[in-house]
Amino acid sequence: MSFLSKNGAGILACLLISILSWYLGGFFPVVGAPVFAIFIGMLLHPFLSSYKQLDAGLTFSSKKLLQYAVVLLGFGLNISQVFAVGQSSLPVILSTISIALIIAYLFQRFFALDTKLATLVGVGSSICGGSAIAATAPVIDAKEKEVAQAISVIFFFNVLAALIFPTLGTWLHLSNEGFALFAGTAVNDTSSVTAAASAWDSLYQSNTLESATIVKLTRTLAIIPITLFLSYWQSRQQENKQSLQLKKVFPLFILYFILASLLTTLLTSLGVSSSFFTPLKELSKFLIVMAMSAIGLKTNLVAMVKSSGKSILLGAICWIAIILTTLGMQTLIGIF
């Protein structure tokens, strides 16, 4: 059986949903195409789940296309930007990432939340929302239901942050620099960071958008050490501390992601415009949308809602802790 005859129907279903989701995401950037894709897929699940000819293509899209998307995501990351954000913001970034991951670990231990779901919510909250979840899910062998739950939780707090952060920043009397750091570290998804920073700029005729975006992209670089650690940890669990294979400890798609980041950094330093990588970054985003479509089509919405109470609570705790941490660190280093 050829690849197309085996996978074509499922891939086509994901493609059609993704085109619609991409279009809707353009009109509602705070929500974003990946979230639309998951929810459209889940709404269609009861009607399409009986069509078994879709299964192979959905599995390919939710697994392989997601890995390809992560590799291409590397072309949007310039490692030299870590140094561009300056010494003042790196302590805030590292503190917020650390506190969210620690909370996720403790929460799953004390409240009996599924380890993989807690991990996805933790990395999504602390690093870069859907992109971090997309990179982490294949590494820890997360189920489609767990990915959908984590994305949904992150989406809720993204939208909430985009709506209330400009007002909260005004109430707290944050400076322009302080709000850029606040939005860049306490909002997960790039589109929501953009929405919050743009709203602030409209209020105060400032230029925080670029600074907030750089902080956000610097957070994204944490995907590299976090996924490598989780891959090693997952391999130890599966192998029961026996001899490990390098391919299992360091998945090839993560290594390719790192190489793509290094290549981007090198070429940019040699004078290549960042716009050169734009088509690859856009393709990465679209493949993530296709993967989310597949995950949605394989997820039972009713069952997910019934079991999502603890994950929402974890997302709320992580979100509040990140807000308090970034404000506290800004106070300590004299920005706030």
From Swiss-Prot:
Subcellular location, record wording? Cell membrane
Q: What is its main location?
A: membrane
For this protein, the record's PANTHER family field holds: INNER MEMBRANE PROTEIN YEIH-RELATED, UPF0324 MEMBRANE PROTEIN FN0533
Name the record gives this protein: UPF0324 membrane protein SP_0034
Provide the topology term for how it sits in the membrane: Multi-pass membrane protein
> Sorted alphabetically, which keywords does the UniProt record give?
Cell membrane, Membrane, Transmembrane, Transmembrane helix
Which family does the entry's similarity section mention? Belongs to the UPF0324 family.
Q: Where are the transmembrane segments?
A: 65-84, 91-113, 118-140, 153-175, 211-233, 249-271, 286-305, 312-334
Highest taxon in the source lineage: Bacteria
Gene Ontology cellular-component terms for this entry are:
plasma membrane
| A Pfam family per the record | Cons_hypoth698
Q: Please list the coiled coil stretches.
A: none
